[in-house]
């Protein structure tokens, strides 16, 4: 479950990129975040994933308050695909995807060991 309470993010004392964001997503729900360019979608996702800090408000993930000490645990259960990204040139597509799982012990990761080394996915 993800719960966001009165989230606000301001950059450089300017107008807030996010203001008064409240959201609750229950386990198993699928949610889309839609809006025009510059409306704060990416900022919201970056805050949820611990890549940015909020100016105000609280976020809970699986009833765990998101803060500097809980971010590593939360990042084991979440992921983010960035709008702008760079591939590691000498890695295959699957290895580029798996680089985000380097510090996890996920059952998902174990699925990739079912494939033989030279088998294409």
Feature-to-residue mapping (PLM):
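Short coil-to-beta microelement around the adenine-binding A-loop and adjacent beta1/P-loop entry
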Residues: 14-16, 72
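The feature captures the beta-strand-to-loop junction immediately N-terminal to the Walker
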Residues: 34-36
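ABC ATPase nucleotide-binding domain signature
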Residues: 78, 82-86, 91
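ABC ATPase NBD coupling module
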Residues: 65-79, 112-117
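Short coil-to-helix segment of the ABC ATPase nucleotide-binding domain corresponding to the Q-loop/switch region
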Residues: 91-105
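ABC nucleotide-binding domain "signature motif"
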Residues: 55-66
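Helix-to-loop junction immediately C-terminal to a conserved catalytic motif
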Residues: 49
């Amino acid at each position: 479950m993800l719960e966001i309470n009165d989230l606000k993010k301001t950059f450089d004392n300017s107008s807030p990129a996010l203001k008064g964001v409240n959201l609750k997503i229950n386990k198993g729900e699928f949610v889309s975040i839609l809006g025009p360019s510059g409306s704060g979608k990416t900022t919201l996702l970056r805050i949820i994933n611990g890549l940015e800090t909020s100016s105000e408000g609280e976020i809970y993930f699986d009833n765990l308050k998101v803060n500097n000490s809980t971010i590593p645990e939360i990042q084991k259960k979440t992921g983010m695909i960035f709008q702008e990204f760079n591939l590691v040139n000498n890695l295959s597509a699957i290895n580029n995807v798996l680089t985000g799982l380097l510090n996890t012990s996920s059952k998902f990761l174990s699925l990739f060991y079912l494939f033989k080394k030279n088998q294409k996915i």
